[in-house]
Regions:
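Peripheral docking tails and interdomain loops at the edges
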Residues: 10-65, 171, 182-256
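Short, small-residue-biased leader/transition segments that mark boundaries at the very start
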Residues: 2-9
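A charged, amphipathic alpha-helical module
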Residues: 45-144, 254-261
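Acidic/glycine-enriched edge-of-secondary-structure segments
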Residues: 10-13, 73-85, 140-161, 218
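Short glycine-rich or small-residue beta-strand-to-loop segments that form or flank ligand, phosphate
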Residues: 6, 40-41, 106-111, 177-183, ...
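Glycine-rich, anion-gripping cofactor-binding loops and their flanking helix/strand elements
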Residues: 6, 142-188
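Short glycine/threonine-rich loop-to-helix capping motif typified by GTGT followed
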Residues: 116-123, 148-157, 192-194
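Short connector loops at secondary-structure junctions
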Residues: 41-49, 133-155, 212-220
Length: 266
């Protein structure tokens, strides 16, 4: 559905590391290689329904599933996936309305799906709510953001686009702040930190990032969030209203076919 909603994006790739996780599991866990276990890990593309059905048919054919059964199950699965995404968006809009009605603030805790795992996020969402903020995920508000383009980075990764769109929503909503959860092991995420910071600071919003790999307990994270809360309170006390001070977009210079004949990029 992202392609339909954001046709201006050049492409929409998903993490190449995640696609290889099943093979990593199979090659490193003896339990899944035991003779009485069939470990299936077909490569599937959720953005291409016909391809998805073909791959599932190939993977499940030996188990007695018919094409009709797989087609019906696939249609129901895709419908439920859209319901799930819409539920998240609806909840995000519900929380934003609640913030206005109760004069409260929220933090968009922008992280990858695996950051939802309490073993990975170390309880950061609960800690933030204990300090008086509501917590929103980036995919609960990204659909409300209208990111201006071109931006400095190549916008081709599915999660990165959600991140930039959610930042675009934060800069236009005075009740929202953003904290980015970043894992050192994800090299692709390294480019997002500077870009998100540029988007936020273009409208005088405070950028905060928490490096998950460096957080062994909540002490450091709590200090960072308390500092953010204090900065927000100081701004409120001084009647400071963030506004646009710069553009986060660029005028991208395109390297044309004609220029290839006369120029060399070093």
């Amino acid at each position: 559905d992202r392609r339909q909603r954001q046709m201006c994006i050049r492409d929409s790739f998903n993490c190449p590391m995640v696609t290889s996780y099943p093979e990593v599991i199979y090659n490193n866990m003896d339990v899944v290689r035991q003779s009485d276990i069939n470990f299936l890990y077909p490569f599937i593309n959720l953005a291409d329904k016909p391809s998805f059905k073909r791959q599932m048919m190939k993977a499940l054919h030996d188990y007695g599933f018919t094409k009709t059964e797989i087609d019906n199950a696939s249609e129901k699965a895709f419908a439920e996936l859209q319901h799930y995404k819409q539920d998240i968006r609806n909840k995000g809009e519900e929380v934003l309305k609640w913030l206005d009605e109760h004069d409260e603030r929220a933090i968009v805790l922008a992280g990858r799906p695996y950051h939802i795992d309490p073993e990975i996020n170390h309880g950061i969402p609960d800690m933030i709510t204990s300090l008086g903020f509501a917590v929103l995920t980036e995919d609960s508000v990204a659909h409300l953001g209208h990111l201006e383009r071109d931006i400095r980075v190549v916008d081709q990764w599915a999660y990165h686009t959600r991140l930039y769109e959610s930042a675009a929503q934060v800069i236009k909503n005075p009740r929202l702040e953003l904290i980015q959860l970043n894992s050192f092991g994800c090299g692709l995420d390294a480019v997002t930190t500077d870009q998100v910071q540029e988007i936020l600071q273009s409208h005088e919003k405070i950028y905060t990032t928490l490096k998950i790999d460096e957080v062994s307990n909540l002490g450091t994270a709590r200090i960072r969030v308390r500092s953010l809360k204090a900065a927000v309170k100081e701004r409120d006390d001084n009647d400071f209203i963030p506004h646009k001070i710069d553009d986060y977009t660029i005028n991208r210079v395109k390297f044309t076919e004609e220029e290839r004949k006369k120029h060399t990029i070093i």
